[in-house]
Curated annotation (Swiss-Prot):
The gene is FAM171A1. Residues 730-759, 818-890 are annotated as: Disordered. Residues 22-303 are extracellular. This is Protein FAM171A1. Glycans are attached at N159, N190, N194. One of its GO terms (biological process) is regulation of cell shape.
Length: 890
């Protein structure tokens, strides 16, 4: 209870204290009456001025007023509060008003104040037709104060003419005269209701009036130009601005009106101001600046401002120029390998995606091998000398970096064919002599077609990186560029793969029926090890032909044709060169649970029976490829040696020419592609162990595929038909299984083509492989090959190439044996290759020997006969009528 009462008393005391304080602060509170004596006199004559009006102002408000008597004295009483500042003002007609501040520090008992009034000077009034001019009455050598305005701005009172007008113009020519003007305390309003008082520093002052006959002021509406000369000792400069203040008699203070401009007239400075009305004007600056008065020159200000703007713009332009120079210099000096990246078109990108995703497990196997053996890979030497003519022989193929702009591109290797007939034949002779010396060192396993092919391939492939090095040295790249070039490729022939192959080789040497490729690695050197082509296999197989350069001539059949359009290849070219792509079937193995194995084909109802039969046969993928019993198969280890000897004998006796070169019946592998792709595939397939295949298949044996088709025409995978045909039924009688898209009829009689006599011989050379596969099921090697036929057009393929009828084992094995014969013969012409191949088949089937040795003229006639059999197409070929593959033609 007591605590609440105490709190209530405290609140009451606070309110009382606030009320008392507010009462004490009210105006008049504590003020005392004071009497002030004011004496008014003439400033020029010091005579008392009677009837002068005296007013006392505080805070722009009049608190007291009075009138002087005849003696010029007036006593004024008013309430004064100590600390307040008062302004005492005296004014009279024909005098310039004057004022003075009054602020005592203590409350006085008596106070007196004297004010001198400056009489106004009469001026000369000049009324013209358009202008009214008022000029000071004192004429002299120096300029005089003057005022002029438009005549129409003058508002004359009624019954008043120009003759009734009187003008007064008074200008302060000295500091003493400036003191005769009202006290210079200015009030500067900022437009927000708040005003600031300033003590002004005067420069000059002027008073101008126009009176009528009865002494009343005459109004002037319009701009009034007031010009006042300045003192000679003024510190102002030309084009300087000085504020103009107008005296308000009702407020007793100076109000800021505008700015006046200082001009230079000869040697005299004048201040000119456009006033809205007549009255008392003063040129002054605030706040007061001690020392000489200095104003800012507007021209200098504008000049500095413009220079600042121009300087900023120049700086910005300089920065932009520096950036442009830096960019240009960077583009010019940037290393070529950093910015020359081939911009592939959208179609080519889509084609590459189709190719890379349609290549079954070969990509996974290669990537797995690369991940298992990281780091730099090389090929070591086994003590075999380099062939003398190998370097010149491979000089016909140049690895050049081409880009659309014509400049080198380290990321786009292209094959440019350039042949020299004399160098080619001399290189072949040297290679033949080298092979005669190496014949004694060939093992039994290397006598097989696969072994000879792999050995000769590695002899030729060691020169291929050297050619790339020469091309790079001609471009002038440094070692850093070569490192980037080597780093952007994956190795094609890796040392761990060869080591693994060498370890697998001795394990199977006990069996004479084993056909295995013992590849002889090329002699190694630091330069060769560093310059091995490390390009990924999938990239090599999917290179678009749009950027390949077409050769100038076609020296022999079987060469790789590089052209931008298939339309440029005429009938003669097709009869000389047969582009083909052969992929071994054992490359393309699918797991049993793969989606494509059980994928149904979208076909008409009349084909459903055939498709069901093919899918039923897919469940037995490991059946024998050839129907011949094993008892009828006899190994012939000397057939390959006989082929090589016969090939060497024919090399010196026959001369090759494009005219007498015999052509292969089916689309075979070109010579360059046979070296770079088929031998590489056969060598790498040996390294794919059963363990790796089972790991990819999820621990289950991978079934043998029927066929595999790769899209190279830029179509998406959704538009590519994946068909599977059992190759094991290809050799059976009555089997007509073939590619659904290639148009190959396996049931067509082989006698329809005279050149098919060697197919039986080739089939008889490979049964040992089948027997060995049955004995050793874990061996990863397989001899089932599937040929991918390149058909640009159905009509062109039938009429020009003449290769629509073939068997997978016929075409694939002939291509392999053809490649082996070419390697054994040292890159002999195609005519010698055909003759040698048929001579090598003679021991297997003597009855077919006369038919195998036929001339080029007979082959051309057979091709014509085959063209006439265009109508004998299989149902599969007639149903599809479209090419299996087509390059991305633009």
């Amino acid at each position: 209870m007591s605590r609440s009462a105490t709190l209530l008393l405290c609140l009451l005391g606070c309110h009382v204290w606030k009320a008392v304080t507010k009462t004490l602060r009210e105006p008049g509170a504590g003020a005392q009456e004071v009497t002030l004596k004011v004496h008014i006199s003439d400033a020029s004559t010091h005579q008392p001025v009677a009837d002068a009006l005296i007013e006392i102002f505080t805070n722009q408000a009049s608190i007291a007023s009075g009138t002087s008597g005849t003696d010029g004295v007036a006593f004024i009483k008013f309430q004064y509060k100590l600390g307040s500042q008062l302004i005492v003002t005296a004014s009279k007609h024909a005098y310039v008003p004057n004022s003075a501040p009054w602020k005592p520090i203590r409350l006085p008992v008596f106070s007196s104040l004297s004010l001198g009034l400056l009489p106004e000077r009469s001026a000369t009034l000049m009324v013209y037709e358009d202008v009214v001019q008022i000029v000071s009455g004192f004429q002299g050598a120096r300029p005089q104060p003057r005022v002029h305005f438009q005549r129409r701005a003058l508002r004359l009172p009624e019954n008043t003419s120009y003759s009734d007008l009187t003008a007064f113009l008074t200008a302060a020519s000295s500091p003493s005269e400036v003191d005769s003007f009202p006290y210079l305390r200015g009030l500067d309003g900022n437009g927000t209701g708040n005003s600031t008082r300033h003590d002004l520093t005067p420069v000059t002052a002027v008073s101008v009036h126009l009176l009528s006959s009865n002494g009343t002021p005459v109004l002037v509406d319009g701009p009034i130009y007031v010009t006042v000369p300045l003192a000679t000792q003024s510190s102002l400069r030309h084009n300087a601005y000085v504020a103009a203040w107008r005296f308000d008699q009702k407020l007793g203070t100076w109000l800021k009106s505008g700015l006046g401009l200082v001009h230079q007239e000869g040697s005299q400075l004048t201040w000119t101001y456009i006033a809205p009305q007549l009255g008392y004007w003063v040129a002054a600056m605030s706040p007061p600046i001690p020392g000489p008065v200095v104003t800012q020159d507007i021209t200098t200000y504008h000049t500095v401002f413009l220079l600042a703007i121009l300087g900023g713009m120049a700086f910005i332009l300089l920065v932009l120029l520096c950036l442009l120079l830096y960019y240009c210099r960077r583009k010019c000096l940037k290393p070529r390998q950093h910015h020359r990246k081939l911009q592939l078109p959208a179609g080519l990108e889509s084609s590459k995606r189709d190719q890379s995703t349609s290549m079954s497990h070969i990509n996974l196997l290669f990537s797995r091998r690369a991940s298992e053996f990281p780091g730099p890979l090389s090929v070591t030497s086994h003590g075999r000398p380099e062939a003398p003519g190998t370097k010149e022989l491979m000089s016909g193929v140049h690895l050049e970096m081409m880009s659309p702009g014509g400049e080198g591109d380290l990321h786009t290797p292209m094959l440019k064919l350039s042949y020299s007939t004399s160098q080619e034949f001399s290189s072949r002779e040297e290679l033949l002599s080298c092979k005669e010396e190496d014949k004694s060192q060939i093992s039994f396993d290397n006598l097989t077609p696969s072994g000879t092919l792999g050995k000769d391939y590695h002899k030729s492939v060691e020169v291929f990186p050297l050619k790339a090095r020469k091309s790079m040295e001609r471009e002038g790249y440094e070692s850093s560029g070569n490192d980037d070039y080597r780093g952007s490729y994956n190795t094609v022939l890796s040392q761990p793969l060869f080591e693994k192959q060498d370890r697998e080789g001795p394990a199977s040497t006990g069996s004479k029926l084993t056909i295995q490729e013992h590849l002889y690695p090329a002699p190694s050197s630091p330069e060769k090890e560093q310059l091995l082509d490390r390009r990924p296999t999938e990239c090599m197989m999917s290179r678009s032909v749009d950027h390949l350069e077409r050769p100038t001539s076609f020296p022999r059949p079987g060469q790789l044709i590089c052209c931008s359009s298939v339309d440029q290849v005429n009938d003669s070219v097709y009869r000389k060169v047969l582009p083909a792509l052969v992929i071994p079937a054992h490359y393309m193995k699918l797991p049993g649970d793969h989606s494509y194995v059980s994928q149904p084909l979208v076909v008409p109802a009349d084909q459903q029976l055939e498709i069901e039969r093919l899918q039923a046969e897919l469940s037995n993928p490991h059946a024998g490829i050839f129907p011949h019993p094993s008892s009828q198969i006899q190994p012939q280890p000397l057939s390959s040696q006989a082929i090589s000897q016969q090939h060497l004998q024919d090399a010196g006796t026959r001369e090759w020419s494009p005219q007498n070169a015999s052509m292969s019946e089916s689309l075979s592998i070109p010579a360059s592609l046979n070296d770079a792709a088929l031998a590489q595939m056969n060598s790498e397939v040996q390294l794919l162990t059963e363990k790796a295949l089972m790991e990819l298949g999820g621990g289950k044996p991978l079934p043998h595929p029927r066929a595999w088709f790769v899209s190279l025409d830029g179509r998406s995978n959704a538009h590519v038909r994946h068909s599977y045909i059992d190759l094991q039924r290809a050799g059976r009688n009555g089997s007509n299984d073939a590619s659904l898209d290639s148009g190959v009829d396996m049931n067509e009689p082989k006698s329809a083509r005279k050149g098919r006599g060697d197919a039986l011989s080739l089939q008889q050379n490979y049964p040992p492989v089948q027997e060995h596969q049955q004995k050793e099921p874990r061996a990863p090697d397989s001899t089932a090959y599937t040929q991918l036929v390149y058909l640009d057009d159905v009509e062109q393929s039938g009429s020009e190439c003449g290769t629509t009828v073939c068997t997978p084992e016929d075409s694939a094995l002939r291509c392999l044996l053809e490649g082996s014969s070419r390697r054994s013969g040292g890159q002999l012409p195609s005519l010698q290759e055909e003759t040698t191949r048929r001579t090598a088949d003679a021991p297997s089937e003597p009855a077919a020997s006369p038919h195998q040795r036929r001339s080029a003229h007979e082959e051309e006639e057979d091709d014509d006969d085959d063209d006439q059999g265009e109508d004998k197409k299989s149902p599969w070929q007639k149903r599809e009528e479209r090419p299996l593959m087509a390059f991305n033609i633009k």
